[in-house]
Design a protein with these regions (language model features):
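Contiguous segments within soluble domain cores/interaction surfaces
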Residues: 19-112, 116, 120-137
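C-terminal motif of bacterial Sec signal peptides marking the signal peptidase cleavage site
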Residues: 14-17
Length: 137
């Protein structure tokens, strides 16, 4: 299990349908999706929305055929801009599930509002990164 400092991705999605490390994706709704090269990255949780407070969510990587993509080592970070202040930052815990291309994240959003988070990876699909901008309710 790896812990990554996040520039505040603290609490994204409440994941239902996870038993142990195994994730049942059919119980989850997409909250955000982005294509990067030949990869599609989908963030999933039970409601499909980001909420203030403690949350769990799933990050899924898929190849250009829609199949699970093992991208190797994945890191996550998040931040929330604060007027006249330094951005909020915090920690998130990212855990591989043992299922190709599927990772669980436990995080806590301290406040509602506009959050920015980054995912980076290094492995069979090379090195890459992307940024998601999400509204936490």
């Amino acid at each position: 299990m790896k812990t990554f400092h996040v520039i505040v991705l603290t609490s994204i999605f409440a994941v239902a349908g996870c038993s142990g490390d195994k994730v049942n994706l059919s119980d989850l709704k997409p909250a955000a999706s982005k294509s990067v090269g030949k990869l599609t990255i989908v963030l999933l949780n039970k409601s499909g929305e980001l909420m203030q407070g403690q949350n769990e969510f799933v990050v899924q990587f898929k190849d250009d055929q829609g199949q699970p993509a093992d991208v190797g080592d994945v890191q996550i970070g998040s931040s929330m801009s604060m007027p006249s202040m330094a951005p909020m930052s915090g920690d998130s815990e990212l855990t591989p599930t043992g299922q190709a291309g599927i990772y669980k994240v436990t995080s806590n959003f301290a406040m509602s509002g506009a959050w920015h988070f980054t995912l980076s990876w290094n492995g069979p699909y090379g090195q890459g990164h992307t940024t998601f901008n999400s509204n936490v309710r």
